Amino acid sequence: DVSTSMLAEDLKPNRLEAAKDVAAEFINGRPNDNIGITLFAGETFTQCPLTVDHAVLLDMIHNIKCGLIEDGTAVGMGIANAVTRLKDSKAKSKVIILLTDGTNNKGDISPLTAAEIAKSFGIRVYTIGVGTNGMAPYPYPVGNTVQYVNMPVEIDEKTLTQIAGTTDGNYFRATSNSK
């Protein structure tokens, strides 16, 4: 998820950087696996197709930033794009790790429909809700400075749990950098 809400600073330095750390840690723990990167906000694209060149993956993760694509949260489209990349893989285990801080509000495919599609190809989806509970400080540019506005944290845990359940994955909640 590269929507601008990932810039909220309830995780340090912000949600996006915390999610990138999780992704890098995952890649480093799977040295022989084919791994790819699909980004989404209001739309989705494949940043890196499946590869075992983890140095390239880590470099690409390092360069991920918000604002690369239209803003919003198209969870279903992100899953569908990842499924397109994984569906023909001969790997015995096909997994999508979905990191998001929001509620689906864009895209032509609902998250639950995308989960059903993933399931039909034997792909498990592990979902991770990124962010604290309550309110989170969000940077808001004002001229040459940045002010912070407390915004409500709106993670659709029900849908993320349903996505994981439909695909035999699991849902996790990351409320701090250590969890």
Mark where each language-model region is.
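Conserved acidic
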Residues: 1, 101
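Membrane-embedded segments
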Residues: 2-94, 109
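Short, conserved active-site loop motifs that form the nucleotide-linked donor/cofactor pocket
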Residues: 35, 123, 169
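Hydrophobic/aromatic beta-strand patches that form the interior of the parallel beta-sheet core
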Residues: 38, 97, 126-128, 172
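Short glycine-enriched loops at secondary-structure junctions
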Residues: 41-45, 131-132, 178
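VWA/integrin I-like adhesion module and closely mimicked acidic/polar interface patches used
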Residues: 70, 84, 95, 102-166
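Juxtamembrane amphipathic/hinge helix adjacent to a transmembrane helix
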Residues: 170-179
